[in-house]
């Protein structure tokens, strides 16, 4: 029986008993106040006894009533508040990440303050500052720009609030307690390896034309995506089997601000006009994620006349899965955000209980202040051969969603 129920039970019982003494209270109220003088010694003793009984009963009733509120208040105070900030609602994967996180945390008994920052750094700074000021017990942060949140992170550290960096590593801050993400270097490797196999680069002489696209330069994950892919592809570029006709191979040249599809499309339009407008075939496009791949695919549909290239991606966003089924995108690396959310909830739970959360990488992710203990989830390659098994049979999508 909870403290609340016990309090109500006691109060009801006392009220019932009190009813039997109402007349006594009324009759002897003056005696309790000391305003009436009994006529005999026996009467005095009787009145004194009843006065004590009434006084004790009233005190007990008051105490019982007082117990109820603090018990309920204590229960509310025990429910920890977790602040979750996501970069934007404009990309499908962040909507799914945020909702999965909120659902998992609430199921585990936490209150959740979920915020989306519309890809605006100043908005995310304000959201984090508010979460710190409003007494969040822990912060889960998927940053827009991993190097731009120093001040609210400093405030969190000063208040002893743990911070979990979610998917994108928060840089140059010693306030970061843990990092949870997918093996992002492996994501890039899988994209590069897919292109090697699809073009049969180990057996064909080539040359094959390829263009390169990655994401926002402020997102530390880009270094892993692009680095993993280029560690696979660079030797084929060096020996001439792969040719980047645009000449754009450096990270700064191939980055896409905010992972924006429109920016990727604009750049691809320019590349097509300058290098492939005469019918020259483009054989492959390395795209670090689905939003950049979508921009490339839109540009190809608008102005490219050669044979359709092999295009990589990541996240399995619904427009890209539809394009995959239609033959307009060869693959996408699937990062099941349900698995990541579950891993983070376990981390949160351990931290809130004063325990060490599970990590599986203590070497790879240095944010500029030291290596951050990290939990890595595994990515999976999705193609037309396995998309039903990976995406539909698992319940991630319904068939209707990707028709």
Q: What are the language-model segments listed below?
A:
Residues 2, 7, 11, 25-26, ...:
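Intrinsically disordered, low-complexity segments enriched in serine/proline and basic residues
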Residues 5, 15-17, 22, 36:
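Short hydrophobic alpha-helical segments enriched in small aliphatic residues
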Residues 23-34, 38, 42-46, 50-53, ...:
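A residue-level marker of the well-folded mature domains of exported/periplasmic proteins
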Residues 64-73:
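C-terminal segment of classical bacterial N-terminal signal peptides
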């Amino acid at each position: 029986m909870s403290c609340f129920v016990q309090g109500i039970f006691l109060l009801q019982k006392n009220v019932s008993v009190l009813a039997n003494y109402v007349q006594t209270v009324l009759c002897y109220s003056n005696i309790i106040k000391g305003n009436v003088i009994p006529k005999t010694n026996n009467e005095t003793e009787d009145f004194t006894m009843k006065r004590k009984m009434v006084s004790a009963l009233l005190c007990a009733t008051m105490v019982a009533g007082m117990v109820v509120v603090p018990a309920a208040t204590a229960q509310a105070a025990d429910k920890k508040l977790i602040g979750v900030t996501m970069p934007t609602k404009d990309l499908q994967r962040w909507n799914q990440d945020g909702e999965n996180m909120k659902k998992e945390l609430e199921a585990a008994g936490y209150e959740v303050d979920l915020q989306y920052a519309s890809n605006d750094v100043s908005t995310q700074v304000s959201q984090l500052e508010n979460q710190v000021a409003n007494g969040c017990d822990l912060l889960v942060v998927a940053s827009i720009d991993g190097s731009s949140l120093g001040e609210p992170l400093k405030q969190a550290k000063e208040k002893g609030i743990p911070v979990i960096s979610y998917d994108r590593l928060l840089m140059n801050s010693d306030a970061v307690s843990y990092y949870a993400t997918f093996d992002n270097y492996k994501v890039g490797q899988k994209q590069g390896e897919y292109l090697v196999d699809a073009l049969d680069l180990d057996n064909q002489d080539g040359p094959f034309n390829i263009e390169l696209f990655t994401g926002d330069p402020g997102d530390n994950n880009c270094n892993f995506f692009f680095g993993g892919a280029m560690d696979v592809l660079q030797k084929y570029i060096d020996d001439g089997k792969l040719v980047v006709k645009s000449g754009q191979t450096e990270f700064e040249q191939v980055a896409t601000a905010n992972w924006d599809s429109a920016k990727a499309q604009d750049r691809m339009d320019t590349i097509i006009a300058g290098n492939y407008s005469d019918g020259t075939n483009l054989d492959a496009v390395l795209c670090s994620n689905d939003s950049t791949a979508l921009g490339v695919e839109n540009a190809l549909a608008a102005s490219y006349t050669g044979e359709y290239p092999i295009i990589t991606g990541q996240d399995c966003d619904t427009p890209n899965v539809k394009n995959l089924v239609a033959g307009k995108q060869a693959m996408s690396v699937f990062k099941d955000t349900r698995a990541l959310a579950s891993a983070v909830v376990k981390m949160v739970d351990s931290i809130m209980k004063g325990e060490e959360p599970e990590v599986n990488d203590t070497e790879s992710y240095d944010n500029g202040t030291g290596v951050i203990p990290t939990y890595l989830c595994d990515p999976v390659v999705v193609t037309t051969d396995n998309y039903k098994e990976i995406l539909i049979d698992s319940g991630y999508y319904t068939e209707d969603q990707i028709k």
